[in-house]
């Protein structure tokens, strides 16, 4: 399990079943997206059969009667589980999921692998929550584009205000999570992420990382030596996480930066 929040889960699942026949009929316990990466699944949902492979995303509706079979044996898939409020956020306020298959475009395939790549490395909960919400929105946009588009703020001024409010909160509270940020500004995480990117040209995560980098540089310029404490203060997972982020941004670790800055760049 890479991400477990109230409204969204992200997991890498390996199903070791060797049963080729159908599983017992049961109601789907969650709203979810199933993205097969290796193998083939056959699914029945309310009597309709689907083939799930690496070129498709299966959109699972809570309560639908389901069965699955594994014709090639064990398979591996990514699962994104969404709460009913989060599904409603993604679908213009209506939590009714248009169940079925979405064919994977090259853009979706790449976004899926980038999401997993970040999850397996040093992405924190804020980044994963934003990436997962944006990915789920991209899937739903192919299944129900009008409903996904219906939640957009009505005017450019409203979009700008929302982005500005988010920037103000992030500047004051660098450790705030995506869910908390969304509550403060009065928008769903998905709509906030989408509007912020449209207005600023940057994701919320990238903007937050720039703010954190600026604070790191200022503190190093002041000679800060407690790097572990600085990492905790700014919301990094640990000192190693901060070191990787700083090195990725400016090409050198915090210790070398401190030496450079306190020596006047000589």
Residue locations for each model-derived region?
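Amphipathic alpha-helical segments enriched in hydrophobic/aromatic residues interleaved with Lys/Arg
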Residues: 93-152, 166
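Basic, amphipathic alpha-helical hairpins
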Residues: 115-123, 138-147, 165-177, 196-200, ...
């Amino acid at each position: 399990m890479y991400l477990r929040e109230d409204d969204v889960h992200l997991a890498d699942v390996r199903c070791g079943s060797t049963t080729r026949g159908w599983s017992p009929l049961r109601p789907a316990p969650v709203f979810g997206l199933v993205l097969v990466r290796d193998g083939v699944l056959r699914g029945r949902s309310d009597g309709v059969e689907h083939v799930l492979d690496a070129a498709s995303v299966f959109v699972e509706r809570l309560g639908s009667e389901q069965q699955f079979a594994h014709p090639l044996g064990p398979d591996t898939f990514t699962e994104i589980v969404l709460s009913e409020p989060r599904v409603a956020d993604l679908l213009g306020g209506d939590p009714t999921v248009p169940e079925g298959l979405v064919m994977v475009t090259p853009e979706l395939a790449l976004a899926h692998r980038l999401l997993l790549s970040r999850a397996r490395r040093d992405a924190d909960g804020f980044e994963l929550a934003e990436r997962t919400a944006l990915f789920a929105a991209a899937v739903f946009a192919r299944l129900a584009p009008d409903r996904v588009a219906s939640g957009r703020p009505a005017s450019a001024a409203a979009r700008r205000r929302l982005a500005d409010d988010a920037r103000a909160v992030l500047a004051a509270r660098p450790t705030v999570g995506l869910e908390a940020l969304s509550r403060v500004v009065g928008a769903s995480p998905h709509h906030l992420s989408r509007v912020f990117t449209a207005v600023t040209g940057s994701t919320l995560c990238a903007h937050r990382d720039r703010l954190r980098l600026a604070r790191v540089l200022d503190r190093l310029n002041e000679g800060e030596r407690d790097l572990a404490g600085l990492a905790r203060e700014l919301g990094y997972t640990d000192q190693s996480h901060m070191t990787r982020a700083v090195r990725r941004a400016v090409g050198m670790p915090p210790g070398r930066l401190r030496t450079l800055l306190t020596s006047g760049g000589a």
